[in-house]
Amino acid sequence: MDRTINVILKPLRRFAIQKPNASLLLFAATIVAMVLANSPWADRYHQLLAFPIDLQAGQFNFFAHHGETMSMLAFVNDALMAVFFFVIGLEIKQEVLIGELSSVRKALLPIIAACGGMIVPVLFYMLVCNTPPEVNGAAIPMATDIAFALAVLGLLGKRVPLSMRIFLTALAVVDDIGGIIIIALFYSGHIAFEPLLISLIVLALLYVGGKFRVHNRLFFYIGGFIVWLLFLESGIHPTIAGVLIAFTVPARPVVKLDDFTCDMTGYLNMLDYTEVRQSRKAEVLTPTQIQVLNNIHTLADKTISPLQTIADKLHPLVNYVILPLFAFVNAGVTFGDIQPQTLVNVPLAVFVGLFVGKTLGIFSFSYLFACTPFASMPTGMSKRNLFGVSMLGGIGFTVALFIANLSFDGSTAAGADLLNQAKLGVFTGSFISGLCGYLVLKWVLPKEKVETI
């Protein structure tokens, strides 16, 4: 099965090597969805979203929830987005173990910044919408889309200090943790304890397996799929399963890099002293050479931790398939259904939460905390730089759309209308935040390349 997965992912990895801009692909999918939703093909578009997804073994349908087959929309949001959150979980674990969240001193400022970027947007949203059912969307402007935010920062090139990229990345990671907690606490349904208990047992087995150096990726793929199925049946949102599974994946390789280097020296010497049979038309290796090369391949594979190997394999799938597909099925705002009087309701609340709430929350919490003895401003960052980065934090998009789908029930007419309004707020808030953040940073950053870290 691991080979099958590699065969599926190999073309995507080759595509990713060319380094196409994943954010542009995401943006293109969004535009296509919006055009289709407001065109003569709108009915076809919505029929596609309702298309049933089946995967059956005998009488058991893997993609059924409470006896109902998943639609394309549900499959993307509940199944494929679990893979996205799995990769997010791997990145969070890496940051906690060895990255910007690995020590209290390094983590404090982005944690405080992220807290401001979650609390203040919710307050601004509730200033505009504070009655049911509109208030259900209060968590929508909490999210920061790290891919889009870093893409906008990347437009400024080498003028951006490395410390600024690190700060924004760490802030977004903490933001993701907050979003995951919110989804787990407030967007899960009635909990069925039997499948939940079984899923926790499977998670424990995955964790113990990792501790006992079971590094077979198939072990985590199969175990993870079982946990996802059980979470689906338990009533807890299945994307949470992706994060929890990620935390069980080992971050230590079987072979340390120093040992790999020593062993490689011996293997290369063995190859040097073995003749190659070759002609103009062919080159034939000896059994010894084949064995040595296979040993090198195995050794190299064991020198990369399962956490990094799995993340590396799944990143192309997430960036070039799952996220564009998510945007395509969720970004279809029907403008004709939006009445002028509703613009001051959910759309305004989400817009203000993202553009004003995120900016003020991140900037004020960060700046005030940096004035205390417990933290300082990152090297190369000024107040003006921080203000520009805070604006980029208002680019919500992916996770904001995801929370919007959880906040409002699109299967009812009233819920679909509110969801449509929320999507409009996400698009406008994210776009204005990105544009203003870019313009501010373009103005305040040094004109020459910076060397600070």
From Swiss-Prot:
Keywords: Antiport, Cell inner membrane, Cell membrane, Ion transport, Membrane, Sodium, Sodium transport, Transmembrane, Transmembrane helix, Transport. HAMAP family: NhaA. Belongs to the NhaA Na(+)/H(+) (TC 2.A.33) antiporter family. The keyword GTP-binding does not apply. Na(+)/H(+) antiporter that extrudes sodium in exchange for external protons. The gene is nhaA. GO terms for biological process: regulation of pH. It is found in: Cell inner membrane. It is a multi-pass membrane protein. The chain crosses the membrane at residues 22-42, 72-92, 108-128, 137-157, 166-186, 189-209, 218-238, 316-336, 343-363, 386-406, 424-444. GO terms for cellular component: plasma membrane. GO terms for molecular function: sodium:proton antiporter activity. The keyword Transmembrane applies. Pfam families: Na_H_antiport_1. It catalyses: Na(+)(in) + 2 H(+)(out) = Na(+)(out) + 2 H(+)(in). This is Na(+)/H(+) antiporter NhaA.
